[in-house]
Design a protein with these regions (language model features):
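Histidine kinase transmitter module recognition
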Residues: 4-7, 77, 103
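Short secondary-structure boundary segments
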Residues: 47, 90, 115
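A glycine-rich helix N-cap at a beta->alpha junction
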Residues: 35-42, 101-122
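Short Asp/Glu-rich motifs
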Residues: 20, 97-98, 104
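C-terminal helix-cap and adjacent tail motif
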Residues: 51, 109-137
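Short secondary-structure junction motifs
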Residues: 10-13, 80-83, 108
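Small-aliphatic-rich amphipathic alpha-helix that forms the alpha element of a beta-alpha
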Residues: 1, 43, 58-99, 111
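Glycine/small-residue-rich phosphate/adenosyl-binding loop
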Residues: 3-70
Length: 137
């Protein structure tokens, strides 16, 4: 994730590793699901709004994109090490703002990380055909 590309190399991110029991219990308030509580650790992927690059032609801010790229690097690295991850973004933003109070930083995703249980059901991922997503002009 540290080597992930970002717009104008701003690297507008911070990653908070949540490992202690107390911190996990606070995090669970923002996303209260049974399966989510089973992870041994979580990584909260934060965007630094004051460091994000903005495209001048349409004022599109690229912070979420940059954090997403770095976060996916993290998920791919975990997968390479036979660890499971899940992208969680349906969390309570008010609770997250209270847990991580900062004028500049905002949570983009929470990534639970852990070993995949042997009895975990494995479903085949449904992906669009390459012809549906790639166009040559």
């Amino acid at each position: 994730m540290r080597l992930a590309p970002s717009a104008v190399n701003r690297q507008p991110w911070k990653f908070v590793v949540v490992r202690s029991k107390e911190a996990k219990e606070q995090l669970w308030q923002a996303y209260d699901r049974d399966w989510f509580r089973t992870a041994p650790l979580y990584i909260v992927c934060m965007k630094n709004n004051s460091e994000c690059w903005t495209r001048r032609y349409d004022d599109k801010q690229h912070g979420d994109i940059d954090v997403a790229i770095a976060t996916e690097h993290l998920c791919l690295a975990a997968t390479e090490r036979n660890l499971g991850t899940c992208w969680v973004c349906n969390f309570d933003t008010d609770i997250m703002s209270r847990l991580f109070p900062s004028a500049d930083f905002e949570a983009v995703a929470i990534i639970p990380v852990g070993h995949i249980a042997e009895d975990c059901p494995r479903t085949e991922k449904k992906r669009k055909a390459i012809e549906e997503i790639v166009e040559e002009i």
